[in-house]
């Protein structure tokens, strides 16, 4: 399943941008959420629109009973109030915000902003710190209108 590979590539990207990234629960959740988002955004051009928000649907057939089979989803309506203390679950809060940014700004602009923001993450950002870095990157790259859309995506998840 290419989405599994793209998810793992997301971890490699973050570790290259910020060596040692992922020290705390929040930063590990951000890492998992970004990995899921990266799998999503990389699959968009080749998915034909088929349940793009379902991550690793081919791989997860062997270990999930829900239909459709998804390792995780990037479109769940989760907020910080839904945290469970499990980084893969809680990462879906972060990935949903990134998914909303993608839908608001388009793939190329969203990916550029999200990737650029991560250069300003420390090894252990909180959700709020990473979100603010992403808003700041949106402002610098695409202007105030984009920054407001990015901020709203994080506000909708209770992150900002």
Model region roles, listed by residue range:
Residues 9:
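Active-site neighborhood of glycoside hydrolase catalytic domains
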Residues 1-6, 14-160:
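Zinc-dependent metallohydrolase catalytic domains
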């Amino acid at each position: 399943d290419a989405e599994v590979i793209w998810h793992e590539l997301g971890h490699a990207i973050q570790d290259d941008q910020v060596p040692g990234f992922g020290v705390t629960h929040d930063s590990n959740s951000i890492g998992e959420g970004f990995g899921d988002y990266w799998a999503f955004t990389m699959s968009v051009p080749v998915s034909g629109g088929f349940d793009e928000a379902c991550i690793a649907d081919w791989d997860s057939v062997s270990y999930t009973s829900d239909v459709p089979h998804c390792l995780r989803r990037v479109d769940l309506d989760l907020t910080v109030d839904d945290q469970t203390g499990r980084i893969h679950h809680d990462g879906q809060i972060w990935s949903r915000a990134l998914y909303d940014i993608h839908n608001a700004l388009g793939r190329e602009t969203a990916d550029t902003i999200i990737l650029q923001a991560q250069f300003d993450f420390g090894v252990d950002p909180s959700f709020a710190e990473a979100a603010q870095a992403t808003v700041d990157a949106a402002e610098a790259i695409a202007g105030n209108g984009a920054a407001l859309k990015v901020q709203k995506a994080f506000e909708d998840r209770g992150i900002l």
